[in-house]
C-alpha cells in the first residue's frame, strides 16, 4: 500500500487487555446443583443451609456434605436413600471424578484432576493477590496486640501474642479491611517508677554507693546494662547519699510494697528533674529493644500509643468525668469504683484509689474512649496473661 503501513497483527502494550484470573468456585457450583435438585422435588421452601466441609482424611474426598441428614426428618426417609438420590444429580458435574455415600448419609465428593489443575492455575496466575478480597470494603479496624509493659524484655508469651495479632491483622487486610496495627505503651504507671528506681540503684552501685537493693524491684541483668550506659555517659552526675534515700523508709518492713513506694518517692525528691531523665532513659531503652525484637520477628506497628499522653491531654480526667455523669461510679472506702458488674464483670473495679491516684483501669477506659473517637468501625484487643 503506497504511503501506508502494513500491520501484520503485532501485539503491543496498548492493545493488550489483561484478563484477571477467574477463581473456580466449586462449592457454589455444587450448591447450585443441589438447589436445582431440591427445586425439582418441590423442596425449595425448606430453605436449608447447604454446607460443604473439608474431610479430615483424604480417603473421604475433597468435600463432604450432610444435606441428606438435614432432609431425613422433613422427608421421613432414610438419609442414605436421600443421599443416593442427590449423588446422582451431583455426578453430572464436570468437576467431579466420583461421588460416594458414607456413614449415616454423608455425601463425599472427589474432584477430577483437571479441576484441581484449574485451581492450581488460578493460584499461580493470582500471584501475591491470591486469597485477597474486598469483603471488608475499607471498613476501619484497629488491632491492638502485644502491648507488653516496657519494663523488661519480651518473653515467649508476648511472642505468641505478636504472631497471633500480626497474622489476624494480615488476614483482615487481605480481606479488604483498612487495618491499623497498634501497640499500647504502659508508660505512666507505678511499674515504670519501679524500673526507674531499679536502674538508678544499680547506677549507684557502679559509683561505689551500694544501698540495699529491694527484693521486689526489677532484678534482671538488663537493669544493670542500662545502669552501665548511664554511668558511661554521665559518670557520677546522679549520685546522692543513700541514707537520704532510706529516710522514713527504714521504719517500714523491707520488701513490702509500701517500702518500695517510699523509695520511689524519695528518689523523685532527691533527683528532682533528673528523675525524668532516668525514667525516660529506661523507658526508651526497653521500648527500643522491644521494637527491634518485633521487627526481627516480622511484626511492625503503625501506631505506638502512649498511656502518658492520655494523662497529659486530659483524656483520663475526661473519661472519669463521663463515668461520673452517667452514674457509673460510686464511692466506697475512700475510693472511686466503676460498676463493672452491671456489664457482666465478676466484680466492680477501682478507677481512683483513696489517695487520689488513678488506676490502670481508669487509663484503659480513657484509651478505649480515644479509640472510638477516631472513627473506627471495630476494635480488636488481643491480650496476654499480664493484661488480665
PLM regions: where:
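Charged, compositionally biased N-terminal leader segments and the immediate start
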Residues: 10-52
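NTP-dependent nucleotidyl-transfer catalytic core
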Residues: 9, 45-65, 70, 77-388
